[in-house]
């Protein structure tokens, strides 16, 4: 298993947890938009709550597609733009302040649309507002997509 992250603090936390669990894990310093990894070298990529803060989500998804083997799978769990128009309008209104206050996190990214545009076919998809979470921040999508050749 290989993990990539631009933040050394995140590496240390993940390495400690992986060691506790006995999981062999290789850490690579880098960004999702320009991974220092060979093309077509992974069967599966797991991405969780990342696209909200990655500066160029499109480039990150293109890089994920590049490092996946033909017909490789992307498994994702993300939050993003709500399907309800009124909620999406509020997300757009408060996103600039939200992004500044919360480390670059964006509320209103159209995750599923981006995945499709990056050359993936959605295989499974679930979505919902998380219970107990304000609707402007609680719309989540999760599923899997296959790299299209």
Map each language-model feature to its residues.
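A short glycine-rich, Lys/Arg-flanked "PGG" loop and its adjoining helix->strand segment in the class I
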Residues: 58-70
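A short acidic, Gly/Pro-enriched loop at the edge of an enzyme's catalytic core
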Residues: 33-45
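A short SAM/SAH-binding and catalytic strip from SAM-dependent methyltransferases
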Residues: 43-56
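Conserved beta-strand signature within the Rossmann-like core of class I S-adenosyl-L-methionine
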Residues: 71-79
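Short "lid" loop at the C-terminus of a central beta-strand within the Rossmann-like core
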Residues: 79-84, 130
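Class I SAM-dependent methyltransferase SAM/SAH-binding core
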Residues: 1-34
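Core SAM-dependent methyltransferase catalytic element
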Residues: 120-123, 127-149
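Short alpha-helix
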Residues: 103-119
């Amino acid at each position: 298993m290989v993990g990539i992250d631009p933040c050394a603090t995140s590496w240390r936390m993940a390495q400690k947890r992986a060691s506790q669990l006995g999981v062999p894990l290789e850490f690579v310093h880098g960004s999702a938009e320009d991974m220092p990894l060979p093309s077509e070298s992974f069967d599966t990529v797991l991405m969780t709550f990342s696209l909200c803060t990655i500066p160029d989500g499109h480039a990150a998804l293109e890089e994920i597609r590049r490092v996946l083997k033909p017909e490789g799978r992307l498994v994702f769990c993300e939050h993003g733009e709500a399907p309800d128009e009124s909620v999406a309008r509020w997300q757009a209104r408060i996103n600039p302040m939200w992004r500044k206050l919360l480390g670059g996190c964006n509320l209103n990214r159209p995750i599923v649309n981006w995945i499709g545009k990056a050359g993936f076919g959605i295989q499974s998809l679930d979505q919902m507002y998380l219970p107990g979470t304000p609707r402007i921040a609680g719309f989540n999508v999760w599923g899997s997509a296959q790299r299209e050749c």
